[in-house]
């Protein structure tokens, strides 16, 4: 951090000194409001509760802050959202499996008063939450698959829906008053005699109230800064606070007039979206594109210096790290690291197909290298037209950051993927990564990633055991054959495909039920009002208000499964180094039986070191990874529709996500020993990276293997 100024050094240091806590305020104000509005339409109740939260949540402004507004009563503290789930709160307050403040990762601290208040508040929510109703509505077979680690939908059933990018361009141009005006025009034009018009009326009324809530919140911030200005003695800080107060009075109510206002407006919108519902991966889109006009005008008029603009960008980026989310421990194990997946994109091309890199792009990359923070996730869209000097600066930032940022995205490949899905050509250039690595059209798409996880290696384990879980002996979906009876690797693949398709179907059924429940109890008007064409259609995102939609949850273990099939083919069918019975016995004993010939450890060494592995540019392994990914990707795209199909958005398919976050570790615990030499409970491969320790021929060979993968299905990234 040697390149940042003193203010930024202090803000960054303060962030690292803060310990995350549990904040009861949002749960308190939200619950009280919902209790007061029983009997009214749910969308109006949630809008009123959103207003009440923003009207009452505590405000604070740090001594060095120049971008203001807070999610909870303290920085990095997490609100509680009891409308989604409550069971895990009770369990973990009692230490099952860990007390929140004693977790081995992502601890949250709390007072006894906070614990008592939350336990009292959740009494109202028992029987009303998305998660408990989903588990009650799921068929027994799906619940069993969930419990055994084949699929898992906790992340979008025990929480709100995220993975969105609102239309920041629109808000910065017209402000939320423009959103309200558009909503009122649609409301005034409704013919209430028409079927469905009443529901549209409720949505538009909720959209107006929700936007008014955010304006009111910003006005409260202005009043707070005005009061602080009267108390401080330092004249420079006094002027600063008065200017911040002026910013908050103007934005996001109206269009931004300066670069500082544009950043403040963007921050308040991002913050409000996280307070409306706690889905993560709410992202910033093409940050450099919508902020550059304000920067350019300020520089032209002499209202700002480049150094001041960099300070503002860095203060903004530090501020994003305050947004936090407490998850259940099982969910935390899949998103370890206080992971919020707030993505910020720069680069790419403009509507004319020219290089879109501008001075704000440079500021972001410099800030990324200077701050060395993990939020926001800075992403660079790399196009053949991208300026080489800018690419060199971004590569230097990667070296400085030392944590993998900025990330580099193939702009052309993602445009091809999106066009293959049916996205309009005029929108392709404007795509942006959302959340972890998913492709999204800002302001036009609903949820870039949504749906149950799929544990591909677990499905292979079931396939090799005739559909039976070897750890519990429970019989799930049965297909012909076992490891001891299959006669070829191709025969295994066909049975594997049948199993995969079955569990993909279970994913879709689960998400249809989840969507129906979210539609019933979790319609969110604010975020919907900032995505086209929700206002015109009078629908929330979950009801089909957006222009584009495609579901699909994270998939993990494709490469591990490919390695396992390649190993079976090599040692059983080609070289005949082992008999099926020998390999089966080694798996049964977790490669630990010393009394066989060869011994379990010797068999494991053979599998790890003498079989083809993905990541070595070896088609004997790579072809299986390609076949598995192609089957999953094409099946999602061609065989399934999400719940918004036929309601307005397109293409409403499912698509393949290979972004496991830390799910490769969590799902590994559900899988026994596998024929690739992996022991029980060990991690699966990460994304489309080779399995741990599998790459033998260096990084070029790894890239050659990865380059063979059928990326055309990877809308949700890899």
Identify the residue ranges that each predicted region occupies:
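Conserved catalytic cores of very large enzyme subunits
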Residues: 1-206, 236, 240-243, 247, ...
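Extended non-globular scaffold/tether segments
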Residues: 205-217
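Heptad-repeat amphipathic alpha-helical coiled-coil interaction surface used
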Residues: 215, 222, 226-229, 238, ...
């Amino acid at each position: 951090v040697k390149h940042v100024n003193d203010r930024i050094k202090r803000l960054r240091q303060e962030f690292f000194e803060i310990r995350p806590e549990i904040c009861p305020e949002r749960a308190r104000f939200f619950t009280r409001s919902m209790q007061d509005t029983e009997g009214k339409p749910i969308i109006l109740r949630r809008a009123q509760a959103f207003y009440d939260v923003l009207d009452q949540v505590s405000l604070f402004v740090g001594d060095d802050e120049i971008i203001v507004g807070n999610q909870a009563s303290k920085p990095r503290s997490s609100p509680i959202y009891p409308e989604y789930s409550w069971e895990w709160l009770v369990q973990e307050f009692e230490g099952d499996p860990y007390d929140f403040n004693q977790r081995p990762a992502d601890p949250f601290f709390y007072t006894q008063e906070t614990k008592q208040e939350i336990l009292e508040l959740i009494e109202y929510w028992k029987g009303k939450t998305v998660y408990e109703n989903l588990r009650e509505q799921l068929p027994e077979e799906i619940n069993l698959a969930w419990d055994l680690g084949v699929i898992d939908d906790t992340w979008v059933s025990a929480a709100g829906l995220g993975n969105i990018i609102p239309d920041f361009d629109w808000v910065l141009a017209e402000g939320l008053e423009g959103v309200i005006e558009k909503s009122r025009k649609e409301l005034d034009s409704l013919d209430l005699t028409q079927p469905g018009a009443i529901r549209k009326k409720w949505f538009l009324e909720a959209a107006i109230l929700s936007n008014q809530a955010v304006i009111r919140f910003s006005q409260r911030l202005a009043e707070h800064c005005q009061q602080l200005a009267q108390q401080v003695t330092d004249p420079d800080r006094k002027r600063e606070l008065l200017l911040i107060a002026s910013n908050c009075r103007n934005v996001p109510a109206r269009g931004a007039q300066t670069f500082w206002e544009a950043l403040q407006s963007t921050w308040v919108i991002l913050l409000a979206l996280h307070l409306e519902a706690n889905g993560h991966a709410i992202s910033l889109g093409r940050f450099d594109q919508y902020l550059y006009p304000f920067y350019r005008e300020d520089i032209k008029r002499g209202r700002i210096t480049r150094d001041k603009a960099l300070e503002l960008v860095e203060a903004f980026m530090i501020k994003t790290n305050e947004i936090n989310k407490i998850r259940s421990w099982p969910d935390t194990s899949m998103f370890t690291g206080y992971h919020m997946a707030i993505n910020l994109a720069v680069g790419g091309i403009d509507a004319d197909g020219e290089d879109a890199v501008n001075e704000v792009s440079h500021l972001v990359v410099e800030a990324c290298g200077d701050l060395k923070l993990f939020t926001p996730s800075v992403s660079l869209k790399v196009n053949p037209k991208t300026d080489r000097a800018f690419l060199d600066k971004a590569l230097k930032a990667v070296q400085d950051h030392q944590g993998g940022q900025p990330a580099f995205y193939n702009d052309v490949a993602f445009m091809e993927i999106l066009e293959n899905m049916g996205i309009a050509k005029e929108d392709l250039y404007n795509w942006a990564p959302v959340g972890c690595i998913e492709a999204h059209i800002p302001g036009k798409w609903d949820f870039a990633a949504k749906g149950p996880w799929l544990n591909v290696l677990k499905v292979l384990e079931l396939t090799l055991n005739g559909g039976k879980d070897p750890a519990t002996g429970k019989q799930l979906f049965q297909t012909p054959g076992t490891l001891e009876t299959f006669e070829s690797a191709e025969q295994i693949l066909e049975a594997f495909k049948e199993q995969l398709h079955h569990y993909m179907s279970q994913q879709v059924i689960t998400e249809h039920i989840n969507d129906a429940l979210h539609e019933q109890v979790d319609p969110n008007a604010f975020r919907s009002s900032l995505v086209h064409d929700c206002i015109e259609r009078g629908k929330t995102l979950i009801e089909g208000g957006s222009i584009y939609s495609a579901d699909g949850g994270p998939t993990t273990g494709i490469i591990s499964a490919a390695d396992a099939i390649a190993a079976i083919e090599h040692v059983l069918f080609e070289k005949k180094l082992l008999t099926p019975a020998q390999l089966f016995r080694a798996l049964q004993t977790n490669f630990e039986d010393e009394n066989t010939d060869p011994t379990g450890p010797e068999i494991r060494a053979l599998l790890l070191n003498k079989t083809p592995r993905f990541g070595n540019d070896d088609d004997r392994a790579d072809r299986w990874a390609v076949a598995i990914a192609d089957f999953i990707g094409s099946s999602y795209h061609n065989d399934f529709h999400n719940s918004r199909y036929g309601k307005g958005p397109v293409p409403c398919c499912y698509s393949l996500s290979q972004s496991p976050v830390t799910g490769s570790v969590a799902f590994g615990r559900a899988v026994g020993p596998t024929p690739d030499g992996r022991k029980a409970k060990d991690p699966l491969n990460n994304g489309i990276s080779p399995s741990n320790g599998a790459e033998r021929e260096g990084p070029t060979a790894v890239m050659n293997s990865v380059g063979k993968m059928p990326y055309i299905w990877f809308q949700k990234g890899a």
